């Protein structure tokens, strides 16, 4: 099977082979609250989103753990553009503020409600690798994320990682379940 992600650059796009989705370049939403007082300029973010979409972009990356991100994305994107004109990826966090499996479901429901949408296009386990991997295993996040897709709350599932190749290899040791 060909790699799921193709190179990114001028005139190229990421391609998800199984879904035929093409993404010219993603729009990261982690730092919307960059002001000293942690407020967000919704008009400025709306303008940024409009420029990005006019240039052909449609993929927005957020996470439950990003302060103000989902709330801002709802106001600047969801309430202003048709749902079929964009893709939203969000992430579950098993290693922070998670004390039981039910916390993962609560995160998901909060994400959907805050964004004001019924489903995510992509749902990822956030920042897999290193010591965080144990939390994903402890709360059975692999099965949880799989169930999110099975319930129609996400079209695609996966993980994100900010770790060394060795840590990522360890996260996929033989006893890890593939989803």
For every predicted segment, state its role.
Residues 2-86, 150:
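N-terminal binding-site loop/beta-alpha segment at the start of enzyme catalytic domains
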Residues 27-29, 62, 90, 122-125, ...:
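Conserved beta-strand positions
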Residues 32, 65, 94, 117, ...:
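Flexible cofactor-recognition loop at the NAD(P)H-binding site
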Residues 36, 40, 50, 98-179:
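Glycine/proline-rich, positively charged
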Residues 84-96, 123-126:
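A short, structured active-site edge motif that brings together acidic residues
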């Amino acid at each position: 099977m060909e790699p799921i992600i193709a190179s990114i650059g001028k005139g190229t796009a990421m391609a998800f082979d199984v879904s035929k989705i093409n993404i010219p370049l993603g729009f990261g939403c982690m730092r919307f609250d960059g002001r000293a007082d942690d407020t967000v300029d919704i008009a400025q973010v709306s303008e940024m989103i409009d420029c990005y979409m006019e240039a052909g972009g449609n993929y927005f990356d957020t996470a439950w753990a990003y302060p103000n991100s989902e709330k801002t994305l709802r106001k600047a994107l969801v309430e202003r553009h048709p749902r079929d004109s964009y893709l939203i990826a969000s992430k579950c966090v098993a290693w922070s503020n998670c004390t039981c499996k039910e916390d993962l479901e609560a995160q998901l429901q909060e994400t959907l409600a805050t964004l004001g949408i019924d489903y995510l296009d992509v749902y990822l386990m956030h920042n897999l690798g290193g010591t965080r991997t144990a939390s994903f295993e402890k709360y059975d996040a692999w099965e949880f994320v799989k169930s999110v897709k099975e319930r129609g709350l996400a079209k695609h599932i996966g993980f994100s990682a900010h770790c060394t190749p060795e840590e990522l290899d360890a996260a996929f040791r033989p006893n890890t379940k593939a989803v």
